[in-house]
Structure formats: C-alpha cells, structure tokens
Amino acid sequence: MDPPDSASRVFSSRILSMVNADDVSAIILAQKNMLDRFEKTNEMLLNFNNLSSARLQQMNERFLHHTRTLVEMKRDLDSIFRRIRTLKGKLARQHPEAFSHIPEASLLEDEDEDPIPPSTTTTIATSEQSTGSCDTSPDTVSPSLSPGFEDLSHIRPGSPAINGRSHTDDEEMPGE
C-alpha cells in the first residue's frame, strides 16, 4: 500500500484540482443535448428513408406500367405500319399508273431500316427485364423517313399548292 503522500496520489489530486466541476457538468449537459438531437435526426432520417422507399416502389410500379403501355403501343404501331405497307403494295399492284413515279424500292420498303435509335431500343429492353422481352423489330417506318413520301416541309403553311408546286414557283402552272 502506498502512504497517503505517495507520488501517484499527489499527481491525481493535482489533476482533479485543475478540472472545474461546473465545466464537466456543462460538457455532460452539452453531450446529452447533442445526443438528443442526433437521436431525433436519426429518427427523422429513418422516417424519410421509409417514405422514400414507399414512393420509389410506387413510382417503379407506375414506370413499369407506362413502359408496358409504350411497348404495347409500339407493337400496335408496328402492326399498323405492316398493314399500311400491305395496302400500299396491293394498291401499287392494282393501280400501277398511280405509282409509276415512285421507285419500286420505296413501295417494298426495306425491312432492315430502323428509325428507332439503338439507345432507345436498349432503354426499352432494359426497362422490361423483369416483365419479359420486348419486340424491337425494325419494321416501324416513319413516313418522313420513307423514300416514297414527298417532303413537304419546305412549303409555307397557308400557301395553296397544286401537285406539290405552289403558285409562287418561278415556272408558270399549266392552264394559267
């Protein structure tokens, strides 16, 4: 046993005399306040996380529903364009004089044309991973991209046109 005036007792008593009890109690009170704030913040973050998870699930379901709707619409449009091509081919066979100015290749329309950019196709396929594969067949052809359609974008709206030519063209129309 150490005598009462041992070096360790003297050292510890001097250290204890340097610490103010009011400062220690103030530090403990500040730590308790911070702990309460952190617990409240943690609880709020947990609630926010739960709410965010629920909203994410709802939005994911809506996104999948809309994606399925878009894929169905694409299939419907593919079917419509196939029917249009079929009707166009029948009309070309029945009335060849009406289609004589259109090149033969535009009547048949190549099946390897894909007006949908690859990034869109990839997006559709990626979003449908959980619901099955999607139809990314390249037989959707936009009239503006088809060589058989005349580009009328250069004509001013409101100007009368006959056979694709306006009255303001340099050449005079027959019968004028």
UniProtKB/Swiss-Prot annotation:
InterPro entries: KXD1-like, KxDL_dom. The keyword Membrane applies. The modification N-acetylmethionine is found at M1. Residues 132-145 have a biased composition (Polar residues). Residues 95-176 are annotated as: Disordered. Keywords: Acetylation, Lysosome, Membrane. The keyword Transport does not apply. Its main location: membrane. One of its GO terms (biological process) is lysosome localization. GO terms for cellular component: BORC complex; lysosomal membrane. It is found in: Lysosome membrane. Transmembrane segments: none annotated. Residues 119-131 have a biased composition (Low complexity). Component of the BLOC-one-related complex (BORC) which is composed of BLOC1S1, BLOC1S2, BORCS5, BORCS6, BORCS7, BORCS8, KXD1 and SNAPIN. Associates with the BLOC-1 complex. Interacts with BLOC1S1. Interacts with DTNBP1/BLOC1S7 (via coiled-coil domain). Belongs to the KXD1 family. As part of the BORC complex may play a role in lysosomes movement and localization at the cell periphery. Associated with the cytosolic face of lysosomes, the BORC complex may recruit ARL8B and couple lysosomes to microtubule plus-end-directed kinesin motor. May also be involved in the biogenesis of lysosome-related organelles such as melanosomes. This is KxDL motif-containing protein 1.
